[in-house]
Design a protein with these regions (language model features):
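Transmembrane beta-barrel strands of outer-membrane/channel proteins
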Residues: 40, 44-48, 92-96, 164-168, ...
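Residue-level signature of outer-membrane beta-barrel architecture
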Residues: 33, 82-84, 94, 135-137, ...
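Short loop/turn motifs that connect adjacent beta-strands in outer-membrane beta-barrel proteins
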Residues: 31-40, 52-53, 81-90, 138-161, ...
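Surface-exposed coil loops of outer-membrane beta-barrel proteins
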Residues: 106-123, 127, 142-248, 252, ...
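Surface-exposed strand-loop-strand hairpins of Gram-negative outer-membrane beta-barrel proteins
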Residues: 50-73, 178-181, 435
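Outer-membrane beta-barrel "beta-signal"
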Residues: 129-142, 369, 438-450
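Signature for the C-terminal beta-barrel architecture of outer-membrane proteins
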Residues: 191-316, 323-326, 330-337, 344, ...
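Hydrophobic, lipid-facing positions within transmembrane beta-strands of outer-membrane proteins
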Residues: 38, 72-78, 127-131, 162, ...
Length: 450
Protein backbone atom coordinates (compact mmCIF):
# COMPACT_ATOMS: atom_id res chain seq x y z
CA UNK A 1 0.00 0.00 0.00
CA UNK A 2 1.34 3.42 -0.92
CA UNK A 3 2.51 5.73 1.82
CA UNK A 4 0.69 9.04 2.39
CA UNK A 5 2.25 12.03 0.55
CA UNK A 6 4.28 14.44 2.69
CA UNK A 7 1.89 17.34 2.01
CA UNK A 8 -1.09 15.34 3.26
CA UNK A 9 0.82 14.31 6.36
CA UNK A 10 1.72 17.95 7.11
CA UNK A 11 -1.87 19.12 6.61
CA UNK A 12 -3.16 16.36 8.85
CA UNK A 13 -0.60 17.15 11.56
CA UNK A 14 -1.45 20.85 11.43
CA UNK A 15 -5.17 20.18 11.71
CA UNK A 16 -4.58 17.83 14.63
CA UNK A 17 -2.37 20.41 16.35
CA UNK A 18 -5.06 23.05 15.85
CA UNK A 19 -7.64 20.77 17.43
CA UNK A 20 -5.33 20.09 20.37
CA UNK A 21 -4.73 23.81 20.73
CA UNK A 22 -8.46 24.38 20.88
CA UNK A 23 -8.58 21.84 23.70
CA UNK A 24 -6.67 24.33 25.79
CA UNK A 25 -8.48 27.55 24.88
CA UNK A 26 -12.07 26.65 23.94
CA UNK A 27 -14.65 27.63 26.56
CA UNK A 28 -15.73 24.49 28.41
CA UNK A 29 -18.30 24.41 31.18
CA UNK A 30 -17.12 23.46 34.64
CA UNK A 31 -17.35 19.79 35.52
CA UNK A 32 -19.55 20.55 38.55
CA UNK A 33 -22.12 22.57 36.61
CA UNK A 34 -25.57 21.05 37.08
CA UNK A 35 -27.44 22.34 34.03
CA UNK A 36 -26.59 23.22 30.43
CA UNK A 37 -28.98 24.89 28.00
CA UNK A 38 -26.54 24.42 25.13
CA UNK A 39 -23.28 22.62 24.42
CA UNK A 40 -20.37 22.90 21.97
CA UNK A 41 -17.70 20.24 22.20
CA UNK A 42 -15.41 18.37 19.85
CA UNK A 43 -12.98 15.53 19.42
CA UNK A 44 -10.02 14.72 17.21
CA UNK A 45 -8.45 11.28 16.81
CA UNK A 46 -5.49 10.01 14.79
CA UNK A 47 -4.82 6.26 14.70
CA UNK A 48 -1.74 4.77 13.03
CA UNK A 49 -1.20 1.03 12.61
CA UNK A 50 1.34 -1.26 10.99
CA UNK A 51 1.48 -4.98 10.31
CA UNK A 52 4.59 -6.95 9.32
CA UNK A 53 4.41 -9.44 6.48
CA UNK A 54 3.03 -12.88 7.32
CA UNK A 55 2.78 -16.33 5.78
CA UNK A 56 -0.11 -17.77 3.79
CA UNK A 57 -0.56 -20.88 1.67
CA UNK A 58 -2.56 -18.86 -0.88
CA UNK A 59 -4.41 -15.58 -1.35
CA UNK A 60 -7.62 -14.57 -3.08
CA UNK A 61 -9.57 -11.54 -4.25
CA UNK A 62 -10.53 -10.37 -0.74
CA UNK A 63 -7.56 -11.63 1.25
CA UNK A 64 -5.52 -9.62 3.70
CA UNK A 65 -2.25 -8.85 1.92
CA UNK A 66 0.72 -10.88 3.14
CA UNK A 67 3.01 -7.88 2.58
CA UNK A 68 4.03 -5.36 5.21
CA UNK A 69 1.42 -2.58 5.34
CA UNK A 70 0.55 0.64 7.13
CA UNK A 71 -2.87 2.08 7.87
CA UNK A 72 -4.16 5.28 9.42
CA UNK A 73 -7.37 7.17 10.16
CA UNK A 74 -8.01 10.76 11.14
CA UNK A 75 -11.35 12.12 12.37
CA UNK A 76 -12.43 15.48 13.78
CA UNK A 77 -16.00 15.87 15.04
CA UNK A 78 -18.13 18.69 16.38
CA UNK A 79 -20.84 18.03 18.99
CA UNK A 80 -23.35 20.86 19.14
CA UNK A 81 -26.58 20.79 21.13
CA UNK A 82 -29.35 23.04 22.39
CA UNK A 83 -32.47 22.66 24.53
CA UNK A 84 -35.35 24.11 22.46
CA UNK A 85 -38.00 23.37 25.12
CA UNK A 86 -38.45 21.52 28.40
CA UNK A 87 -37.15 17.97 28.12
CA UNK A 88 -36.03 18.44 24.52
CA UNK A 89 -32.48 18.29 23.18
CA UNK A 90 -31.36 18.75 19.56
CA UNK A 91 -27.87 17.65 18.49
CA UNK A 92 -25.85 18.22 15.32
CA UNK A 93 -22.51 16.52 14.61
CA UNK A 94 -20.42 17.54 11.57
CA UNK A 95 -17.33 15.42 10.96
CA UNK A 96 -14.27 15.36 8.72
CA UNK A 97 -12.49 12.05 8.05
CA UNK A 98 -9.64 10.61 6.04
CA UNK A 99 -7.60 7.44 6.11
CA UNK A 100 -6.26 4.33 4.47
CA UNK A 101 -7.13 0.75 5.44
CA UNK A 102 -5.06 -2.40 5.33
CA UNK A 103 -5.68 -4.25 2.03
CA UNK A 104 -8.57 -1.95 1.04
CA UNK A 105 -10.51 -3.05 4.12
CA UNK A 106 -10.61 -6.75 3.29
CA UNK A 107 -9.33 -10.03 4.68
CA UNK A 108 -10.63 -9.86 8.26
CA UNK A 109 -13.87 -10.09 10.20
CA UNK A 110 -12.54 -8.25 13.24
CA UNK A 111 -10.93 -5.20 11.65
CA UNK A 112 -8.24 -3.57 13.73
CA UNK A 113 -9.51 0.04 13.87
CA UNK A 114 -13.07 1.04 14.69
CA UNK A 115 -12.66 4.37 12.90
CA UNK A 116 -12.23 2.65 9.52
CA UNK A 117 -15.99 2.45 9.02
CA UNK A 118 -16.08 6.23 8.54
CA UNK A 119 -13.21 6.91 6.15
CA UNK A 120 -13.46 6.77 2.37
CA UNK A 121 -9.97 7.72 1.22
CA UNK A 122 -6.88 9.80 1.84
CA UNK A 123 -8.59 13.07 0.88
CA UNK A 124 -10.49 14.77 3.73
CA UNK A 125 -14.25 14.16 3.54
CA UNK A 126 -16.74 16.38 5.36
CA UNK A 127 -20.21 15.09 6.14
CA UNK A 128 -23.10 15.34 8.59
CA UNK A 129 -22.65 12.52 11.07
CA UNK A 130 -25.73 13.02 13.26
CA UNK A 131 -28.79 15.27 13.48
CA UNK A 132 -31.36 14.15 16.02
CA UNK A 133 -33.88 15.10 18.69
CA UNK A 134 -33.90 13.53 22.14
CA UNK A 135 -37.06 14.10 24.20
CA UNK A 136 -37.25 13.07 27.87
CA UNK A 137 -40.58 12.57 29.65
CA UNK A 138 -40.07 12.48 33.42
CA UNK A 139 -42.17 9.91 35.32
CA UNK A 140 -41.09 10.35 38.95
CA UNK A 141 -39.15 7.99 41.21
CA UNK A 142 -36.63 10.55 42.44
CA UNK A 143 -34.08 12.67 40.62
CA UNK A 144 -30.61 11.93 39.28
CA UNK A 145 -27.88 14.01 37.68
CA UNK A 146 -26.93 13.59 34.02
CA UNK A 147 -23.31 14.60 33.53
CA UNK A 148 -22.07 16.77 30.66
CA UNK A 149 -20.55 14.71 27.85
CA UNK A 150 -20.42 14.47 24.07
CA UNK A 151 -24.02 14.65 22.82
CA UNK A 152 -25.21 14.92 26.41
CA UNK A 153 -26.06 18.10 28.33
CA UNK A 154 -25.82 18.30 32.10
CA UNK A 155 -29.14 18.39 33.90
CA UNK A 156 -31.50 16.64 36.28
CA UNK A 157 -33.93 13.91 35.17
CA UNK A 158 -36.30 11.53 36.93
CA UNK A 159 -34.98 8.04 37.63
CA UNK A 160 -38.18 6.75 36.05
CA UNK A 161 -38.51 8.28 32.61
CA UNK A 162 -39.29 7.70 28.95
CA UNK A 163 -36.74 8.88 26.37
CA UNK A 164 -37.46 9.15 22.65
CA UNK A 165 -34.66 9.70 20.12
CA UNK A 166 -35.63 10.56 16.54
CA UNK A 167 -33.50 11.49 13.54
CA UNK A 168 -30.09 10.69 12.08
CA UNK A 169 -27.91 8.74 14.53
CA UNK A 170 -26.35 5.31 15.10
CA UNK A 171 -27.93 2.21 16.60
CA UNK A 172 -24.86 2.00 18.83
CA UNK A 173 -25.61 5.45 20.29
CA UNK A 174 -28.51 3.86 22.18
CA UNK A 175 -27.98 0.08 22.19
CA UNK A 176 -25.12 -2.19 23.29
CA UNK A 177 -23.48 0.20 25.73
CA UNK A 178 -20.60 -1.02 27.88
CA UNK A 179 -18.50 0.97 30.33
CA UNK A 180 -15.30 -0.94 29.53
CA UNK A 181 -15.49 -1.72 25.79
CA UNK A 182 -17.40 0.74 23.63
CA UNK A 183 -15.34 3.57 22.14
CA UNK A 184 -12.47 2.81 19.70
CA UNK A 185 -11.23 6.37 20.16
CA UNK A 186 -10.40 5.84 23.83
CA UNK A 187 -10.71 2.10 24.62
CA UNK A 188 -10.18 -1.08 22.57
CA UNK A 189 -9.70 -0.44 18.85
CA UNK A 190 -10.77 -3.74 17.26
CA UNK A 191 -14.31 -4.11 15.92
CA UNK A 192 -14.72 -7.26 18.02
CA UNK A 193 -14.38 -5.26 21.23
CA UNK A 194 -16.52 -2.14 20.73
CA UNK A 195 -19.66 -4.06 19.77
CA UNK A 196 -20.77 -7.58 18.95
CA UNK A 197 -19.05 -8.63 15.72
CA UNK A 198 -22.18 -10.63 14.84
CA UNK A 199 -24.50 -7.63 15.38
CA UNK A 200 -25.43 -6.78 11.78
CA UNK A 201 -27.15 -3.55 12.79
CA UNK A 202 -28.87 -1.43 10.13
CA UNK A 203 -26.80 1.57 9.02
CA UNK A 204 -24.99 3.08 6.07
CA UNK A 205 -21.34 2.18 5.50
CA UNK A 206 -20.26 4.82 8.05
CA UNK A 207 -22.49 3.32 10.74
CA UNK A 208 -25.41 5.81 10.77
CA UNK A 209 -29.02 5.90 9.62
CA UNK A 210 -32.42 7.50 10.19
CA UNK A 211 -34.99 6.20 12.60
CA UNK A 212 -36.11 6.24 16.20
CA UNK A 213 -35.32 4.65 19.55
CA UNK A 214 -37.57 4.56 22.62
CA UNK A 215 -36.21 3.90 26.12
CA UNK A 216 -38.18 3.28 29.30
CA UNK A 217 -36.19 3.66 32.54
CA UNK A 218 -37.80 2.10 35.63
CA UNK A 219 -35.66 1.80 38.78
CA UNK A 220 -32.78 -0.56 37.84
CA UNK A 221 -34.38 -1.65 34.55
CA UNK A 222 -34.25 -0.17 31.05
CA UNK A 223 -36.21 -1.43 28.04
CA UNK A 224 -35.24 -0.14 24.60
CA UNK A 225 -36.78 -0.55 21.16
CA UNK A 226 -35.67 1.06 17.91
CA UNK A 227 -36.08 0.91 14.16
CA UNK A 228 -33.48 2.25 11.72
CA UNK A 229 -32.94 2.54 7.99
CA UNK A 230 -30.33 0.38 6.30
CA UNK A 231 -28.34 0.68 3.07
CA UNK A 232 -29.85 0.31 -0.40
CA UNK A 233 -27.14 -2.24 -1.17
CA UNK A 234 -25.38 -4.28 1.54
CA UNK A 235 -22.62 -2.23 3.18
CA UNK A 236 -23.31 0.71 0.87
CA UNK A 237 -23.39 4.41 1.72
CA UNK A 238 -26.76 5.44 0.16
CA UNK A 239 -29.64 4.68 2.52
CA UNK A 240 -32.92 2.94 1.76
CA UNK A 241 -35.57 5.26 3.23
CA UNK A 242 -38.42 2.73 2.93
CA UNK A 243 -38.35 2.26 6.69
CA UNK A 244 -41.73 0.54 6.71
CA UNK A 245 -40.47 -2.11 4.29
CA UNK A 246 -36.69 -2.40 4.72
CA UNK A 247 -35.32 -1.78 8.21
CA UNK A 248 -33.45 -3.01 11.25
CA UNK A 249 -35.31 -3.52 14.54
CA UNK A 250 -33.62 -3.76 17.95
CA UNK A 251 -35.06 -4.74 21.33
CA UNK A 252 -32.84 -4.58 24.43
CA UNK A 253 -33.52 -5.16 28.11
CA UNK A 254 -30.99 -3.88 30.66
CA UNK A 255 -30.75 -4.70 34.37
CA UNK A 256 -28.48 -2.80 36.72
CA UNK A 257 -27.35 -4.37 39.99
CA UNK A 258 -24.55 -4.40 42.56
CA UNK A 259 -22.46 -7.17 44.06
CA UNK A 260 -21.63 -5.64 47.40
CA UNK A 261 -20.62 -2.11 46.43
CA UNK A 262 -19.45 -3.13 42.95
CA UNK A 263 -21.89 -2.10 40.17
CA UNK A 264 -22.73 -4.20 37.16
CA UNK A 265 -25.16 -4.36 34.25
CA UNK A 266 -26.56 -7.11 32.04
CA UNK A 267 -28.09 -6.34 28.65
CA UNK A 268 -29.96 -8.82 26.47
CA UNK A 269 -30.42 -7.81 22.84
CA UNK A 270 -32.54 -9.17 19.99
CA UNK A 271 -32.40 -7.74 16.48
CA UNK A 272 -34.18 -8.39 13.20
CA UNK A 273 -33.45 -6.97 9.74
CA UNK A 274 -35.63 -7.03 6.66
CA UNK A 275 -33.89 -6.16 3.39
CA UNK A 276 -33.06 -7.33 -0.11
CA UNK A 277 -30.21 -9.74 0.60
CA UNK A 278 -28.57 -12.78 -0.94
CA UNK A 279 -29.02 -16.21 0.59
CA UNK A 280 -25.73 -18.12 0.84
CA UNK A 281 -27.18 -21.43 -0.31
CA UNK A 282 -28.69 -19.72 -3.37
CA UNK A 283 -25.35 -18.05 -4.09
CA UNK A 284 -23.49 -21.35 -3.78
CA UNK A 285 -25.93 -23.03 -6.15
CA UNK A 286 -25.36 -20.24 -8.67
CA UNK A 287 -21.60 -20.65 -8.45
CA UNK A 288 -21.68 -24.41 -8.89
CA UNK A 289 -24.04 -24.23 -11.87
CA UNK A 290 -22.10 -21.40 -13.56
CA UNK A 291 -18.46 -22.51 -13.33
CA UNK A 292 -17.48 -20.33 -16.28
CA UNK A 293 -18.45 -17.06 -14.59
CA UNK A 294 -15.18 -15.25 -13.78
CA UNK A 295 -16.87 -13.15 -11.10
CA UNK A 296 -16.90 -15.24 -7.93
CA UNK A 297 -18.87 -12.69 -5.93
CA UNK A 298 -21.90 -14.90 -6.46
CA UNK A 299 -23.94 -13.17 -3.78
CA UNK A 300 -24.50 -10.27 -6.19
CA UNK A 301 -26.12 -12.62 -8.73
CA UNK A 302 -28.85 -13.84 -6.37
CA UNK A 303 -29.55 -10.65 -4.42
CA UNK A 304 -33.27 -10.73 -5.16
CA UNK A 305 -36.25 -10.79 -2.85
CA UNK A 306 -36.58 -9.67 0.73
CA UNK A 307 -34.91 -11.73 3.45
CA UNK A 308 -35.17 -11.72 7.22
CA UNK A 309 -31.95 -11.77 9.24
CA UNK A 310 -31.89 -11.90 13.03
CA UNK A 311 -29.76 -12.54 16.09
CA UNK A 312 -29.59 -12.59 19.89
CA UNK A 313 -26.88 -11.40 22.24
CA UNK A 314 -25.91 -10.80 25.86
CA UNK A 315 -23.65 -8.01 27.11
CA UNK A 316 -22.23 -7.88 30.67
CA UNK A 317 -20.16 -5.27 32.47
CA UNK A 318 -19.04 -5.78 36.05
CA UNK A 319 -16.74 -3.86 38.36
CA UNK A 320 -14.54 -6.35 40.22
CA UNK A 321 -12.52 -3.85 42.28
CA UNK A 322 -12.26 -0.10 42.78
CA UNK A 323 -10.04 0.27 39.73
CA UNK A 324 -10.92 -2.80 37.65
CA UNK A 325 -13.85 -4.07 35.61
CA UNK A 326 -14.60 -6.93 33.24
CA UNK A 327 -16.83 -7.22 30.19
CA UNK A 328 -18.38 -10.01 28.14
CA UNK A 329 -20.31 -10.02 24.87
CA UNK A 330 -21.77 -13.08 23.14
CA UNK A 331 -24.05 -13.17 20.10
CA UNK A 332 -25.50 -15.70 17.65
CA UNK A 333 -27.09 -14.73 14.31
CA UNK A 334 -29.06 -16.97 11.97
CA UNK A 335 -26.29 -16.97 9.35
CA UNK A 336 -28.35 -17.74 6.26
CA UNK A 337 -28.06 -14.37 4.50
CA UNK A 338 -25.15 -12.15 3.53
CA UNK A 339 -23.85 -9.32 5.68
CA UNK A 340 -26.22 -6.35 5.61
CA UNK A 341 -24.31 -3.46 7.16
CA UNK A 342 -21.51 -4.56 9.52
CA UNK A 343 -18.92 -7.32 9.27
CA UNK A 344 -18.56 -11.00 8.37
CA UNK A 345 -19.52 -12.93 11.51
CA UNK A 346 -22.45 -15.18 12.39
CA UNK A 347 -21.45 -15.77 16.01
CA UNK A 348 -19.09 -13.79 18.21
CA UNK A 349 -17.64 -13.88 21.70
CA UNK A 350 -15.44 -11.28 23.38
CA UNK A 351 -14.28 -10.78 26.96
CA UNK A 352 -11.74 -8.63 28.68
CA UNK A 353 -10.49 -6.58 31.62
CA UNK A 354 -10.23 -2.80 31.93
CA UNK A 355 -7.94 -1.21 34.52
CA UNK A 356 -8.18 2.37 35.79
CA UNK A 357 -4.82 4.08 36.24
CA UNK A 358 -5.86 5.23 39.70
CA UNK A 359 -4.54 1.86 40.88
CA UNK A 360 -0.98 3.06 40.16
CA UNK A 361 -1.42 6.78 40.73
CA UNK A 362 -2.38 7.69 37.15
CA UNK A 363 -6.08 8.38 37.56
CA UNK A 364 -6.70 9.44 33.95
CA UNK A 365 -4.88 6.49 32.36
CA UNK A 366 -6.59 3.29 31.24
CA UNK A 367 -5.32 -0.16 30.26
CA UNK A 368 -7.19 -3.08 28.77
CA UNK A 369 -6.70 -6.65 27.65
CA UNK A 370 -9.24 -8.71 25.70
CA UNK A 371 -9.80 -11.96 23.82
CA UNK A 372 -12.36 -12.46 21.05
CA UNK A 373 -13.52 -15.22 18.73
CA UNK A 374 -15.67 -14.92 15.61
CA UNK A 375 -17.39 -17.83 13.87
CA UNK A 376 -19.30 -18.51 10.64
CA UNK A 377 -22.50 -20.41 9.93
CA UNK A 378 -22.26 -23.63 7.86
CA UNK A 379 -23.97 -21.84 4.96
CA UNK A 380 -21.36 -19.07 4.80
CA UNK A 381 -18.49 -21.54 5.30
CA UNK A 382 -19.64 -23.67 2.37
CA UNK A 383 -19.94 -20.61 0.15
CA UNK A 384 -16.39 -19.45 0.93
CA UNK A 385 -14.90 -22.95 0.72
CA UNK A 386 -16.27 -23.33 -2.81
CA UNK A 387 -14.44 -20.17 -3.90
CA UNK A 388 -17.19 -17.62 -3.32
CA UNK A 389 -16.26 -14.03 -2.53
CA UNK A 390 -18.13 -12.08 0.14
CA UNK A 391 -18.05 -8.34 0.82
CA UNK A 392 -14.98 -8.26 3.09
CA UNK A 393 -13.52 -11.76 2.83
CA UNK A 394 -12.80 -14.44 0.24
CA UNK A 395 -9.48 -16.28 -0.11
CA UNK A 396 -10.62 -18.51 -2.99
CA UNK A 397 -10.66 -21.51 -0.65
CA UNK A 398 -11.22 -22.09 3.06
CA UNK A 399 -9.65 -24.27 5.73
CA UNK A 400 -12.19 -23.17 8.32
CA UNK A 401 -11.28 -22.20 11.85
CA UNK A 402 -12.70 -19.51 14.11
CA UNK A 403 -11.01 -16.13 13.80
CA UNK A 404 -9.30 -15.40 17.13
CA UNK A 405 -8.14 -12.04 18.46
CA UNK A 406 -5.93 -10.91 21.32
CA UNK A 407 -5.77 -7.17 22.02
CA UNK A 408 -4.00 -5.12 24.68
CA UNK A 409 -3.75 -1.33 24.97
CA UNK A 410 -2.53 1.39 27.31
CA UNK A 411 -3.97 4.92 27.16
CA UNK A 412 -1.72 7.58 28.70
CA UNK A 413 -3.21 10.95 29.59
CA UNK A 414 -0.61 13.50 28.53
CA UNK A 415 -2.43 16.82 29.07
CA UNK A 416 -5.98 17.71 30.12
CA UNK A 417 -8.22 15.72 27.74
CA UNK A 418 -5.41 14.65 25.41
CA UNK A 419 -4.39 11.00 25.45
CA UNK A 420 -1.78 8.86 23.72
CA UNK A 421 -2.43 5.12 23.40
CA UNK A 422 -0.33 2.16 22.35
CA UNK A 423 -2.13 -0.93 21.05
CA UNK A 424 -1.13 -4.46 20.04
CA UNK A 425 -3.36 -7.01 18.30
CA UNK A 426 -2.72 -10.62 17.32
CA UNK A 427 -5.12 -12.29 14.88
CA UNK A 428 -5.13 -16.04 14.36
CA UNK A 429 -6.89 -17.52 11.30
CA UNK A 430 -7.63 -14.21 9.52
CA UNK A 431 -10.93 -14.44 7.61
CA UNK A 432 -11.49 -17.84 9.29
CA UNK A 433 -8.72 -19.50 7.29
CA UNK A 434 -6.17 -21.69 9.09
CA UNK A 435 -4.03 -21.67 5.91
CA UNK A 436 -3.23 -17.98 6.47
CA UNK A 437 -1.53 -16.08 9.27
CA UNK A 438 -1.26 -15.45 12.15
CA UNK A 439 -0.92 -11.66 11.84
CA UNK A 440 0.38 -9.03 14.27
CA UNK A 441 -0.75 -5.40 14.33
CA UNK A 442 0.98 -2.54 16.16
CA UNK A 443 -0.78 0.77 16.68
CA UNK A 444 -0.67 4.22 18.25
CA UNK A 445 -3.55 6.60 18.87
CA UNK A 446 -3.67 10.32 19.65
CA UNK A 447 -7.03 11.57 20.93
CA UNK A 448 -8.25 14.94 22.20
CA UNK A 449 -11.58 16.28 23.40
CA UNK A 450 -12.33 19.97 23.69
Amino acid sequence: MCSVPISQTVRRACLLALCFGMAGVAPVRAADEQFESWTAKGQSTYIWQQKPGFGAAYSGQNSLSTAREKSYTFTATGYFGVRPWSGGEVYFNPEVTQGSAFSNLSGLAGFTNGELTKVSGTNPTFYRQRLFLRQTFNLGGGREQIESDLNQMAGMVDKNRFVLTVGNFSVLDVFDDNAYAKDPRTQFMNWDNWSYAAFDYAADSRGYGWGFAAEWYKDDWVVRFGRMTGPRQPNGLPLDYQIGRHYGDQLEVERGYSIGELPGKVRVLAWRNRAILANYNDALTYGLTNPGDPDHQWITKVRTGEKIKYGFGVNVEQAVAKYAGVFLRAMKADGRSETYAFTEADASLSAGVSLDGGAWGRGKDTAGIALARNMLSPDRRNYLAAGGISFFIGDGALNYRGENLFEVYYSLNIWRKVGLSLDYQHVQNPAYNADRGPVNFYGARLHAEF
